[in-house]
């Protein structure tokens, strides 16, 4: 969006608006969809439709060259809003398969391994894009192609835009093992209208029984706030890095590779922490780390380190990350990637520990609501703060507050100890 719009501050504002609209759509539909699918039984048919839609929307972003998009900016914003909504539905349906596939005892490790594996694939993809499309023609290394493969035109942003087609293709191919190998729930005898009415009744009953489900509802309230903060970091982190550090495609690919490697460690770390200290304490530690590091990120820039001016020389003559602020920013971003990935995995595991087993689908519907339907809040705060402050750093400042509020609410959640202790209790 920075290249398509031409202004990083405006780009951050427009992306915030798109995610806000997508979040509103999910808020109105996700819990009822989760409850209805719970009544129908199988999740995979719905998941297949969501994945197919995601693939098409992501691929459509190919038509956004920086020199006059084939799609108008309004259409691009609508596509991003659609991706936001579809990803939320995907998360809900995918998470509802976690416990049937891995069981209660294996949910934590499976969740962490899944995120670690996904980020490992991301590393391979980003390195491939770097070697095939970003570096050729920019550095004189003999082992590289002389120009981007397939004759892609840099003037039209094609080496950047090809990533949308690659991501869409990998998503389609990567979904095949899930549909082939992961077990699904048995189909009920209910028709779609009957499941809709029964699911609506389940949600109404859940609201009526709020006192009986107070503990998981407190957790979901906490997650609603801190996940908004984490989602804002994920959505705007790339825009923020490109804007405040003045990074182009080459640097952003290197940044993405580094963060993906760090995220692999985060996924593996989550599984270990969930088993040894329990997912609740794990989430607390991960959020505390996020709050500290995200605050430090606000003090970074091309000419400043941790809120202090910097004007030193280059550290080396390489193609990217040649200054101390860039190296420090890279390190802080890596810690954020570790903590965010671990927090996502641990919070997903925590819900499987505190939610009633027979209401898992409904609570995962509410889980998506707490993490995605209120995505309008994070983007709205970022959009408003960016407009008022006039800088990207001001725009990201509310994120720290969301993380802190979520951590405070999490203190009131019971349970979430290591599985052996919880079973014994």
Protein language model regions, located:
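Intracellular juxtamembrane helix-capping segments at the cytosolic ends
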Residues: 89-102, 342-355
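Short amphipathic helix-loop junctions that connect adjacent transmembrane helices
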Residues: 1-12, 235-255
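C-terminal ends and interior cores of transmembrane alpha-helices
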Residues: 49-70, 289-322
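Cytoplasmic membrane-interface "Motif A"-like loop-to-helix N-cap segments
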Residues: 37-52, 275-291
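A membrane-interface helix-boundary motif in multi-pass transporters
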Residues: 43, 133-168, 316, 321-324, ...
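Helix-to-loop junctions at the C-terminal end of transmembrane segments
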Residues: 28-42, 265-279, 300, 305, ...
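Multi-pass alpha-helical transporter architecture, strongest
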Residues: 62-63, 170-181, 300, 396-425
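Juxtamembrane intracellular "pre-TM" segments in multi-pass secondary transporters
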Residues: 183-220, 316-320
């Amino acid at each position: 969006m920075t290249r398509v719009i031409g202004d990083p501050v405006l780009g951050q504002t427009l992306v915030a608006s798109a995610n806000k609209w997508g979040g509103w759509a999910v808020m109105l539909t996700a819990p009822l969809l989760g409850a209805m699918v719970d009544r129908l039984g199988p999740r995979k048919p719905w998941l297949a439709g969501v994945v197919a839609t995601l693939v098409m929307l992501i691929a459509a972003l190919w038509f956004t060259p920086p020199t006059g998009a084939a799609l108008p900016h309004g259409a691009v914003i609508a596509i991003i809003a659609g991706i936001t909504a579809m990803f939320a539905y995907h998360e809900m349906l995918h998470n509802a398969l976690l416990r049937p596939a891995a069981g209660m005892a294996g949910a934590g490790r499976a969740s962490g391994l899944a995120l670690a594996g996904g980020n490992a694939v991301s590393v391979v993809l980003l390195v491939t894009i770097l070697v095939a499309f970003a570096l050729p023609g920019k550095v004189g290394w003999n082992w590289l192609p002389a120009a981007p493969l397939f004759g892609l035109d840099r003037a039209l942003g094609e080496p950047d835009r090809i990533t949308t087609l690659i991501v869409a293709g990998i998503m389609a191919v990567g979904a095949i093992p899930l549909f082939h190998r992961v077990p699904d729930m048995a189909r009920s005898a209910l028709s779609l209208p009957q499941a809709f009415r029964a699911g609506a009744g389940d949600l109404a009953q859940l609201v009526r029984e709020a006192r009986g489900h107070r503990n998981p509802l407190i957790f979901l309230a906490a997650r609603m706030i801190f996940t908004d903060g984490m989602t804002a970091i994920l959505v705007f982190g790339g825009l923020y890095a490109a804007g405040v550090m003045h990074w182009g495609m080459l640097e952003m690919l290197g940044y993405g590779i580094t963060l993906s490697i760090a995220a692999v460690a985060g996924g593996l770390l989550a599984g270990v922490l969930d088993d040894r200290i329990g997912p609740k304490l794990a989430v607390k530690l991960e959020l505390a780390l996020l709050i500290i590091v995200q605050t430090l990120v606000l003090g970074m820039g091309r000419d400043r380190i941790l809120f202090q001016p910097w004007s030193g020389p280059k550290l080396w003559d390489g193609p990217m990350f040649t200054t101390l602020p860039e190296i420090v920013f890279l390190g802080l971003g890596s810690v954020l990637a570790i903590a965010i990935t671990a927090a996502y995995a641990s919070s997903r595991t925590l819900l499987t520990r505190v939610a009633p087993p027979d209401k898992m689908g409904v609570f995962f519907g509410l889980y998506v609501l707490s993490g995605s339907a209120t995505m309008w809040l994070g983007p709205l705060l970022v959009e408003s703060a960016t407009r008022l402050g006039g800088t990207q750093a001001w725009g990201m400042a509310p994120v720290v507050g969301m993380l802190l509020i979520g951590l405070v609410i999490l203190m009131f959640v019971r349970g979430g100890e290591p599985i052996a202790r919880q079973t014994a209790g």
